[in-house]
Amino acid sequence: MAAEGEVIACHTVEDWTEKLKAANESKKLIVIDFTATWCPPCRFIAPVFADLAKKHLDVVFFKVDVDELNTVAEEFKVQAMPTFIFMKEGEIKETVVGAAKEEIIANLEKHKTVVAAA
């Protein structure tokens, strides 16, 4: 896996499968940015996403190019870019469509820590 504080870019389905499995086993929150090189909002949010990865070392950040890994995008039912999927231990917790910085940050904080039921 990439060093802490970095966004992990996967370029093959095999690489994606291997890295996602390792991330799921870590039990950390996973945030996946489904992006495209031709998408202006994707380019706008990319530095914000990279900055969040640097600030939240207890979260695993992935970047998936929908044109490179279209089967992965289809698996997650991505319809528009950017789409951010928040997952924990293989379960999708939240989906954010669009370059909505505040919504991404709010979901990051919401799902990062799970409070044990009393």
Curated annotation (Swiss-Prot):
GO terms for molecular function: mRNA binding; oxidoreductase activity, acting on a sulfur group of donors, disulfide as acceptor. Keywords: Acetylation, Chaperone, Cytoplasm, Disulfide bond, Electron transport, Redox-active center, Transport. CDD domains: TRX_family. One of its GO terms (cellular component) is plant-type vacuole. GO terms for biological process: defense response to fungus; heat acclimation; protein complex oligomerization; protein folding; response to heat; response to microbial phytotoxin. Its main location: cytoplasm. Disulfide bonds join 39-42. Interacts with FBA5 and FBA8. Interacts with FBA6. Interacts with MDH1. Thiol-disulfide oxidoreductase that possesses disulfide reductase and insulin disulfide bonds reducing activities. Heat shock causes oligomerization and formation of high molecular weight (HMW) complexes with concomitant functional switching from a disulfide reductase to chaperone. Belongs to the thioredoxin family. Plant H-type subfamily. This is Thioredoxin H3. It comes from Arabidopsis thaliana. The gene is TRX3.
